[in-house]
Amino acid sequence: EETYKVYPFHFHLEIGYRLEDASVSVMWKVKNINDKEMHFAIGAHPAFFCPLHEGEKQSEYCLGFRNGQGKVPEALVNTVFGEGGVVTTQKKEYKLTDGCLPMDEHLFDGDALVIEDHQIQKVVLMDPQKKEYLAVEFDAPLVVIWSPPKKQAPFVCIEPWYGRCDSEIFDGELKDRDWENTLAAGEEFEASYRIIVE
């Protein structure tokens, strides 16, 4: 009932986990239990240890990317975060070298990388020798990657999102937000992502 005060929809959410070899799949099921349309967004918030070993720095590590065809993109376009947790209309392009984006000391200075439009379906963490040690696979239209700037935090988050926070120029209803999802009465939404330890 507390949720209903700020989000005027009744829903049923199921989250499941499946372990298989060196991977874990996370499954979501959202059911609209209203007698009207429901608008929603859902996303994951997994964080991964980085750097792996004592004496290493996160800035020595690299992010690798694959698109939906398993190919390595030449560049990524990031939607830039602004003040107050909203995205701006600004875009920033990152050129990749062999599909790799170094996690230098300034990569997250502007907050998170927000990669939209199904540009990628897999993010890989690579150690200083460019050895892949962890991957996140997903079908989500967006992925958000971040680590606290200027804090040398020992983790990086790789978050598949079905939906996104508001844009700084957004002025409308929930149903009109970019990347918002809609379910008719009684309908269900299902999605998943997979974490693979290499």
PLM regions: where:
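Beta-strand-rich interaction surfaces with strong enrichment in secreted/lumenal proteins
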Residues: 14-16, 178-183
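Active-site/ligand-binding surface loops and adjacent short beta/alpha elements
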Residues: 37-39, 47-138
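Extended, loop-rich substrate-binding clefts of extracytoplasmic carbohydrate-active enzymes
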Residues: 1-21
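Short, structured beta-strand/loop micro-motifs enriched in basic residues and often containing a Trp
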Residues: 168-176
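Asparagine-centered strand-capping/turn motif at beta-strand->loop junctions
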Residues: 28-34
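Glycine-rich active-site loops that engage anionic ligands at enzyme catalytic sites
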Residues: 126-166
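Hydrophobic core residues within well-ordered beta-strands of beta-rich domains
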Residues: 13, 24-26, 189
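Short Pro-Gly-centered flexible turn/kink motifs
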Residues: 28, 181-197
